[in-house]
Amino acid sequence: MVKPFEPEFQQALDELTTSLQPFLDANPQYKKALEIVQVPERVLQFRVVWEDDQGVAQVNHGFRVQYNSALGPYKGGLRLHPSVNLSILKFLGFEQTFKNALTGLSMGGGKGGSDFDPKGKSDSEIRRFCFSFMGELFRHIGSDTDVPAGDIGTGGREIGFLFGAYKKLRNEFTGMLTGKGLTWGGSFIRPEATGYGLIYFVEHMIAKACPEYSLDKPSTLVAISGSGNVAQFTALKVIELGATVLSLSDSKGSLISDKGYTKEFIRKVADLKLKGGSLASLANEEGYTYHAGARPWTLIPTIHIALPGATQNEVSAEEAEALLKAGVRIVAEGSNMGCTADAIDIFESSRKAGPGGVWYAPGKASNCGGVAVSGLEMAQNSQRLAWTTQEVDSKLKDIMAECYGICLTAGTKWSGEELTDEVLPSLLSGANVAGFIKVADAMKAQGDWW
């Protein structure tokens, strides 16, 4: 159910509804499930009053959208960014519900956060904000109820402050947050999980659609947007495998490398971002050019693999056309809803045209590695044990392979297209239908629709 002025949520709902149409035509009883699943189970909105370093009271809006618990405790990140509003959090929680279903783990869907901006704030100000935020949120979360995590603006520092506040308020040490430090309940591979998982998913896509562009070849050219956690570890995994990364970006522009990034340079980017710096300051390095106000997609003449990793709606229709002209074969979202609806239409039309077309993977499938390892962190916490890096990475690879297989099968069966050997199935339809069926069936079994 869309309220007025919720464009992001409307976009996510429209995408799901369109993808589900062939399935709903064949199974009309599920139309009632769609009507009900789009309404969050609970929406929490509260004020967050905190003291800045000058002793002045500041106020922000706090939110938690507890979207769906049919498959397990609500699970989804906390976003701290000035753009945060209810429409964005409803869209993210809605997407999270079906993304979590695709991991095969027992997790429901949720999302939360605040319009607080951690940029430019001191550690003390962030700590005071986090303690105030948790002062309300703690009533509504817990390891078997709702398990938040990090997101944009919420890194290890913020998770630590939030965990500490909860521990003081509840007087208990539980796994009620994921993304924790390794010495106090965190999991190996969690920081890397979204980026690594994206590449594990993309490797399956490449093997089926365009093995000539495998990631063990330096001649395979990869464009990545963003420069935060997702983009950094996506780039590091691509470089480790042997392909060439040509771009990163931030909110002010894009940094393009003619010869390709190195692991050392990505680590330099990570250090810069920890200090709140801009990629523009690295443009003087040899072979790196900064383009203010532009995203990477129109700046590179040849791209084989495009991986949006910044934020929602970061690939427009015009940029999608530019990617087609650059020869792109795979577009997989590291960000949530990274492509606009018009851009997705262009990619899907290219896929339907046959050999040489673009194969597009939506974020709910391709970037589910992050929440998958959050689920593995929950499992480790519940058993009071810690798995090794190799164990977690192996489980992540298995989850991404299973997710790819589920999406491929459902896309083949329910896309409503007359597929031939030359036309690839729609992973967009596959992800939406497979995730929806799993959630809807659980809801029906629990009496949420009939």
Curated annotation (Swiss-Prot):
Task: Specify whether Oxidoreductase is a keyword of the entry.
Answer: yes
Q: Which Gene3D superfamilies match?
A: Glutamate Dehydrogenase, chain A, domain 3, Leucine Dehydrogenase, chain A, domain 1, NAD(P)-binding Rossmann-like Domain
What is a single Pfam family found in this protein's UniProt entry? ELFV_dehydrog_N
CDD domains with a match to the protein in the record: NAD_bind_2_Glu_DH (cd05313)
Annotated GO molecular function terms are: glutamate dehydrogenase (NADP+) activity
Keyword Nucleotide-binding, does the record have it? Answer: no
What is the reaction catalyzed? L-glutamate + NADP(+) + H2O = 2-oxoglutarate + NH4(+) + NADPH + H(+)
What EC number(s) does the entry state?
1.4.1.4
Name the chain's protein: NADP-specific glutamate dehydrogenase
Q: Which organism is it from?
A: Hebeloma cylindrosporum
